[in-house]
Every structure is written in structure tokens, then in C-alpha cells.
Design a protein with these regions (language model features):
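Flexible, low-complexity junctional segments that flank or bridge functional domains
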Residues: 4-5, 25-251
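Bacterial N-terminal signal peptides that target proteins for export
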Residues: 1-9
Length: 251
């Protein structure tokens, strides 16, 4: 009887593992098939941005002059909010964006939001590429002679991971971004291992982390962009002021 129970338990566990694996695979496939949204301003955003700009220029306690200097400041803050660590955009992206840096007053004061949305869409694409690259690194783990999984990183090599890249130069090529992210993923893995996790568990944690980031990326909405643009403007005018979208205000 005990033998029969053990066999039944083994079969049950095997079936459960198979179902779980198939479900996880199906989820991954479903996520891969979801495209990035092509975000564009909604009808109400143009009116809202003009009203917000008017409130600041007419009703703020300090005089706000909408000119090229303010436009440049808002542009710089917008880019910083999109890529604070300078490990997503390429230098060529930034060079292209800078052509519109003095047009950002039209973005918030006249409701001509297409420039800001175009930049955001490029950011989403670059982030997707980075997370996909990070996942590809995790899949390169090594199987040792005793069949144990080992991390695909050499932790005996002396390398430096720069956490603060706020003032770092923009990457000149995809290869340069890849190297930045190789070291980032290596640092993420090392932190988990130092916290006591074996590599298989650390890999699982990082895989879930990067896949969740992709999922969140693909759930981006037009209102997310609008809030970021308006916050960039508001915080240049007054560092302690924020714009909260109606959707987020209800949470």
C-alpha cells in the first residue's frame, strides 16, 4: 500500500511540474507576442497641457517666462526622467532628440505633444532591447561536470559597476550598451548570490524581474507619457510641484 502511495505521489508531482512548466511557457509565449504600444497623445491632452501651462504662467507665485531657456530645461529633465542612468538611449538618439530641445515650449504651452511621445516610444523600444539582452545573458549559464548550473559570469575578474551614471557619456554603439548591461546583470546576480541564493534561484529571480519589466513596459499608456511631460515642466518651474494624472489620483 505504501509503495502504491509513493508511486501515486511521484506521478502527481510529475504531472504538477509538467503543468506548471507548460503554464509558465505559455505565459512567456503570450508576453512575447504582445507588441509594444505605439503611444500617441489623446484628444484631451492638448487642451489639458495648455491649461496647465497657463495656470503656471499666470497664477504661480513667481513669474514664469516660456522661452528657449525654459524649453531647454524641460527637455533636459524629460530626458533625465526617461534615462537617468544613461544606459538606455544611444548617443545618436540624444543627438536626434536635441534637434527639438528648443521646441519643448510648444509641447506644454501649445499642446503639440508629438515630439515628447516620439521620444517616449524610442525609449520603450530601447528598454525592451535591454531587457531582452539581459535575459539572453541569463540563458548562457554553464553546466559544470557535476551537472550543476553555474552563473555565466566570472566573479574573479576585477570589474567596476558604476551605479551613478547621471553625468556619464552616452553610449556610442549597441555594443557599448551591451557591455554596460553585461556588467549590470553581473552585479545583480552577484548581489543575490552574496545574499545567500544559489545560482539557479538567483537566475529565477532575475528572469522574473526582467520579464516583469517587459510586461510593465508593454502595459504603458498614453496617460503615462502625458504625466511625465507635465511633471518635467512642473518641476522645472517649482521643484516641489507635481502633476498627477486622473488615473493615478484615483489610486
Amino acid at each position: 500500500m505504501q509503495k502504491i502511495c509513493r508511486i501515486a505521489l511521484a506521478v502527481s508531482l510529475s504531472v504538477s511540474f509538467s503543468i506548471g512548466s507548460n503554464y509558465a511557457f505559455a505565459q512567456d509565449e503570450a508576453l512575447n507576442e504582445i507588441p509594444l504600444p505605439a503611444l500617441a497623445p489623446e484628444t484631451q491632452h492638448a487642451t489639458a497641457s495648455k491649461r496647465i501651462a497657463a495656470r503656471f504662467t499666470r497664477g504661480h507665485y513667481k513669474k514664469v517666462k516660456i522661452d528657449d531657456a525654459l524649453s531647454q530645461e524641460v527637455f533636459d529633465r524629460y530626458i533625465k526622467q526617461l534615462d537617468y542612468g544613461r544606459n538606455v538611449f544611444l548617443a545618436t538618439d540624444i543627438a536626434e532628440f536635441k534637434k527639438h530641445s528648443l521646441d519643448f515650449d510648444d509641447v506644454f504651452a501649445r499642446g503639440k505633444l508629438s515630439i515628447a511621445y516620439s521620444i517616449y516610444n524610442v525609449n520603450m523600444q530601447r528598454r525592451l532591447e535591454r531587457y531582452q539582452y539581459a535575459l539572453s545573458l541569463l540563458d548562457k549559464d554553464i553546466v559544470s561536470d557535476d551537472k550543476a548550473q553555474q552563473p555565466p559570469f566570472d566573479f574573479t575578474t576585477k570589474e567596476v559597476y558604476a551605479y551613478d551614471r547621471e553625468d556619464a557619456p552616452w553610449a556610442q554603439s549597441k555594443a557599448e550598451l551591451d557591455e554596460l548591461w553585461r556588467i549590470k546583470v553581473k552585479a545583480d546576480a552577484l548581489n543575490l548570490i552574496l545574499a545567500g541564493k544559489e545560482w539557479p534561484k538567483a537566475k529565477e529571480v532575475l528572469t522574473k524581474r526582467y520579464k516583469y519589466a517587459i510586461k510593465r513596459l508593454k502595459q504603458s499608456e498614453s496617460e503615462d507619457v502625458f504625466q511625465l511631460v507635465m511633471n518635467s515642466f512642473a518641476r522645472v518651474v517649482e521643484p516641489h510641484t507635481s502633476y498627477l494624472s486622473p488615473r493615478n489620483a484615483e489610486r
